């Protein structure tokens, strides 16, 4: 195996990524080197491409980015015992310290010292990626490489949706991006009574309809209260999944929640936006922030969903070779795409 590889690198502090030849990551005793087959583009990667304020404060330059992937094991460290060369895998993109109070209590997703693959350390937009053995997840043979490559965002959706009991509940999802749509699918499959999803992007609304979400609402032209009445809802929503990061959508969600309703919040909203806290108080709402995936309970659950028949393939709207990466990022930046999966083989 050559000691050099192709990779997409944030090599300059400006807009874009660049395909370069870089050294293959070194494998430590507890590490696993994975030959990447498929990579998916995340909204985080778009922020890095755009070199916005968050990226400028967060991303070291130069660095290989990307964190959504699937592949096969190319090499294992001397202390690795659970995996073997050739095994099909994906990986948890949050690397935790294992030493803080939350880690020691089995709550790794709450680690205060989390390092993000492709954010704080070299990522998966390359022919190889190296992660600790503890972050590797084996992929069953009946799950394809492209579906395994979107397990990271699917895990966000599963973690958010399953934060509260959904059986028999009326669920509002704000934001029909890929994670929002997947969250709505999980809610529907988990026994929710009514599932309503809102957005203002026509492409995303059409994608939500294509994937079988029962009630898809264009918030730019439809009144949510009227929709609720038309589908037989006489009270507010029991569970809200806030996926949009849009202040108007969040405020509308709070308005439409039933007393005692529960809201799981994944969307990252603008700093300093206002909500009516009196409504939160007098409705006795339960707000819960969500970040990443529970390690590794969420992974077990999402594998079970897919093996149980949940079809995520339609959420992938663009399948391209890695040399077409610019087209993939343009599709993501336009907002007129679902997931974009790039092929490294």
UniProtKB/Swiss-Prot annotation:
Sites where the protein binds Zn(2+) 1: 42, 67-68
Q: Where does NAD(+) bind?
A: 179, 199, 204, 266-268, 290-291
Subunit composition and interactions = Homotetramer.
The EC designation for this entry is: 1.1.1.103
Known catalysed reaction(s)?
L-threonine + NAD(+) = (2S)-2-amino-3-oxobutanoate + NADH + H(+)
According to its UniProt record, which residues of this chain constitute the active site? 44, 47
Pathway per its UniProt entry is: Amino-acid degradation; L-threonine degradation via oxydo-reductase pathway; glycine from L-threonine: step 1/2
One Pfam entry name: ADH_zinc_N
Gene Ontology cellular-component terms listed? cytoplasm
Q: What does this protein do?
A: Catalyzes the NAD(+)-dependent oxidation of L-threonine to 2-amino-3-ketobutyrate.
Free-text cofactor note: Binds 2 Zn(2+) ions per subunit.
Keyword Membrane listed: no
Which compartments does it reside in? Cytoplasm
State what protein this is by name: L-threonine 3-dehydrogenase
Name a biological process GO annotation. Answer: L-threonine catabolic process to glycine
Q: Which family does it belong to?
A: Belongs to the zinc-containing alcohol dehydrogenase family.
- Give the residues the record marks as binding Zn(2+) 2: 97, 100, 103, 111
Coarsely, its chief localization is cytoplasm
GO MF terms here are:
L-threonine 3-dehydrogenase activity; zinc ion binding
From which organism does this entry originate? Answer: Rhizobium leguminosarum bv. trifolii (strain WSM2304)
